Design a protein with these regions (language model features):
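Glycine-rich phosphate-binding active-site loops on the catalytic face of alpha/beta enzymes
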Residues: 22-28, 94-103, 150-161, 195, ...
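Short beta-strand/loop segments at the ligand-binding rim of alpha/beta enzyme cores
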Residues: 1-4, 68-72, 123-135, 180-192
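N-terminal capping/small domains of soluble enzymes
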Residues: 1-80
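Hydrophobic alpha-helical segments and helix pairs
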Residues: 82-115
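Catalytic cores of alpha/beta
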Residues: 14, 80-91, 134-146, 178-184, ...
Length: 242
């Protein structure tokens, strides 16, 4: 089992016993990251909320900042972006396809964009699809039938003021884990949402999760470092970097 440091925190936090996910990167740069963070990042009683909208310096920069043993988080905004990204990203580079950012002005099912099905290859250790918390079973079916065998549940929960993250995702992640493990036991599920302590990871493991992703807990780097070490050192969970 593997512990991931979710994007965007994986851009900054690197641990020997966890895999950092960098990004999320888009085909073309989307400037204005600092401004959007200041304007929209807020802590609420339901969790952290943001409306950053995939602001980033583009895939070319992202590739320079991502090590071979890390995972490159990417997203398509235009209908040819998957094809354009696939032509740039090395065939052996591990990726996470973010199909569900709720913070864009336009929300489309990017699994219908050309080239989405070209990403699974035998050369990638990780070829993950990060799905929305409200993902329908038909969407999950489609992703698996296209050849993807690693699914991350889930992205932030959309609200009118931006995406919410944290423990509020738990019931959605639980629903997705249960469905995938019932229908497709060969699919590896990465569980995320509210993991702040080792027992949170154990809870997801008991539901059937294969791996874990730590996100907003990373706002406290020392605490997340301790949590990663506790998860890796707990024999009842048995997590280790693979």
């Amino acid at each position: 089992m593997t512990t991931f440091i979710s994007a965007p925190f994986g851009n900054y936090l690197k641990f020997k016993n966890a895999v950092s996910v960098t990004g999320t990167w888009t085909y073309k740069p989307r400037p204005g990251l600092f401004k959007q963070v200041v304007k929209t990042l807020r802590y609420t009683r339901n969790g952290w909320r943001n409306k950053i909208g995939l602001r980033n310096r583009g895939i070319e920069y992202g590739l320079q900042k991502t090590n071979f043993n890390e995972v490159l988080s990417i997203a398509a905004i235009s209908e040819h972006d998957w094809i354009n990204l696939e032509s740039i990203v090395p065939e052996s580079q591990s990726v996470e396809l973010n199909i569900s950012c709720p913070n864009l002005d336009v929300h489309e099912d990017t699994t219908i964009f050309n080239g989405f099905d070209a990403w699974p290859t035998i050369y990638r250790k990780w070829c993950i699809v990060k799905v929305p918390p409200m993902a329908s079973y038909s969407l999950l079916d489609k992703i698996v039938k296209l050849g993807f065998t690693q699914i991350h549940a889930s992205n932030t929960l959309p609200t009118d003021k931006g995406g919410l993250s944290g423990a509020i995702l738990l019931p959605h992640t639980r629903r997705i884990i249960r469905y995938l493990k019932k229908e497709y036991d060969h699919v590896e599920v990465i569980a995320g949402g509210g993991i702040k302590e080792a027992w949170h990871a154990e809870f997801y493991k008991d539901l059937g999760a294969d791996h874990f992703s730590i996100g907003t807990a990373c706002f406290n780097p020392f605490k997340v470092w301790r949590t990663v070490n506790e998860i890796n050192g707990d024999p009842s969970i048995g997590v280790h970097q693979t």
